[in-house]
Amino acid sequence: MAKGQSLQDPFLNALRRERVPVSIYLVNGIKLQGQVESFDQFVILLKNTVSQMVYKHAISTVVPARPFNVAGHQNAQGGYGAQDDMPSGE
């Protein structure tokens, strides 16, 4: 299962570390906006005026509001949060 998340985890971690605003579209068409606060294998914690736990199986699309750098934000952990910052190697 780790191979399936080899793109997903660095993408979400870069969004989290750079505090990039995102729009998350759910499979039912609802649009959520905020910043990725943390995530794991099953959920994303999205922060705006409140924090929302969004299950990944309900997500259709994640759209960053601005360009960001995915390179250098990878580590071998299965989830990321504010206290899990790893050296970026940049």
Curated annotation (Swiss-Prot):
Among the GO biological process terms of this entry, one is: regulation of translation, ncRNA-mediated
Which residue intervals define the domain Sm in the entry? 9-68
Report keywords, A-Z.
Answer: RNA-binding, Stress response
A molecular function (GO) term: RNA binding
Identify the Pfam families for this entry. Hfq
Q: Which GO terms describe its cellular component?
A: cytosol
InterPro entries, per this entry?
Hfq, LSM_dom_sf, Sm
Key word RNA-binding present in the record?
A: yes
Record HAMAP family:
Hfq (MF_00436)
Provide the family line.
Answer: Belongs to the Hfq family.
Which PANTHER family would you find in this protein's record?
RNA-BINDING PROTEIN HFQ
Assembly and interaction partners? Homohexamer.
Q: What does this protein do?
A: RNA chaperone that binds small regulatory RNA (sRNAs) and mRNAs to facilitate mRNA translational regulation in response to envelope stress, environmental stress and changes in metabolite concentrations. Also binds with high specificity to tRNAs.
The name of this protein is: RNA-binding protein Hfq
List the source organism: Shewanella oneidensis (strain ATCC 700550 / JCM 31522 / CIP 106686 / LMG 19005 / NCIMB 14063 / MR-1)
Q: What is the lineage of its organism?
A: Bacteria, Pseudomonadati, Pseudomonadota, Gammaproteobacteria, Alteromonadales
